[in-house]
């Protein structure tokens, strides 16, 4: 199908669709597209890496920006919101669903893998890639990720694999919200002022929002900074190439890169090492709204990405400005 030849009426209907779940045209054109979910703009860095590795694929990006960030919400609310989005995305019959949100993966990734007949892959802090050379590592995460069993188990496994590395998790209660509100356009100090002042050998970004201020964090600490976007995109590419579309596919990086795991491991109960660092100031929790009220569609200029959710227009604009031009 030539998108340019068929988009005149389609785009108009899609953008202004009043129907929850999108128009019939949208569902037909993007049926079988790879689906990504994030609470807001964070997962756009993952979308960009996926587009780089899979240029012929179509994608759907669902952003629940009106309730972002998720990191300060209770796990029950997070799982409810993610489940709402996943149910809508399942209607597009995706070959895979990517949770481009560390908080969503930590809180409900495993339950979604048990529910759906397609692979569900999730973003995890890249502690296994970062810990290979040892040293003291700062792991920046949201409050919900910090308190999850999944994250504790991940740290425990990383410490067992790399005993020369020490991981210090740090809950950033306001950083994702600052990035969401400013679209990473503020001076470095705005994002780094509340971070720990200690020196570290490496920093791991445990929230996809943080990737948008990666350079600011690198300048602050003067050490390598790791995020999981590329590793997650690689896992998706391998999953699709291998035809792993059966129910129960765990989406773990261990399945594909047992020696060079760049994006986390299977989760189970456990405990990670903690340091008594001062957390960022907690911000207020966004008011809840029905996601079905924000289901009209917006499509990227090249016709490859359908944006859904309350932040569809914001995410499309930020994606086009920050990433899409680099794909041409």
Predicted segment positions?
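Glycine-biased, low-complexity coil/linker segments
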Residues: 21-22
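Extreme N-terminal basic, low-complexity initiation segments
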Residues: 5-10
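Non-catalytic structural scaffold of enzyme domains
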Residues: 1, 16, 26-328
């Amino acid at each position: 199908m030539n998108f340019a030849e068929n988009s005149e009426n389609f785009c108009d209907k899609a953008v202004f669709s009043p129907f929850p779940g999108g128009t019939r045209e949208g569902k037909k054109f993007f049926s079988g597209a790879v689906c990504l979910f994030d609470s807001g703009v964070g997962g756009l860095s993952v979308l960009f890496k996926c587009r780089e590795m899979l240029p012929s694929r179509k994608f759907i990006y669902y952003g629940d920006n009106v309730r972002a960030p998720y990191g300060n919400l209770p796990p029950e609310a997070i799982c409810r919101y993610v489940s709402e989005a996943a149910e809508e995305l399942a209607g597009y019959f995706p070959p895979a669903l990517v949770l481009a949100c560390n908080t969503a993966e930590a809180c409900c990734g495993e339950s979604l893998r048990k529910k759906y007949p397609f692979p569900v892959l999730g973003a995890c802090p890249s502690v296994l890639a970062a810990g290979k050379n040892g040293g003291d590592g700062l792991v920046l995460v949201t409050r919900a990720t910090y308190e999850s069993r999944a994250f504790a188990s991940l740290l425990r496994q990383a410490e067992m694999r790399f005993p020369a590395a020490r991981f210090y998790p740090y809950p950033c209660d306001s950083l994702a919200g600052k990035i969401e509100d400013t679209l990473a356009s503020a001076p470095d100090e705005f994002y780094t002022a509340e971070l720990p002042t200690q020196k570290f050998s490496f920093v791991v970004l445990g929230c996809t929002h943080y990737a948008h201020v990666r350079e600011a964090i690198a300048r602050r600490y003067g050490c390598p900074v790791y995020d999981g976007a590329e590793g997650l995109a690689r896992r998706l590419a391998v999953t699709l190439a291998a035809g792993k579309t059966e129910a129960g596919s765990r989406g773990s990086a261990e399945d594909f890169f047992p020696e060079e795991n760049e994006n986390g491991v299977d989760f189970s109960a456990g405990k990670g090492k903690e340091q008594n660092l001062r957390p960022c100031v907690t911000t207020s929790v966004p008011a809840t709204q029905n996601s079905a009220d924000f289901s009209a569609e917006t499509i990227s200029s090249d016709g490859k990405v359908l944006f859904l959710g309350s932040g569809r227009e914001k995410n499309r604009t930020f994606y086009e400005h920050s990433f899409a031009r680099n794909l041409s």
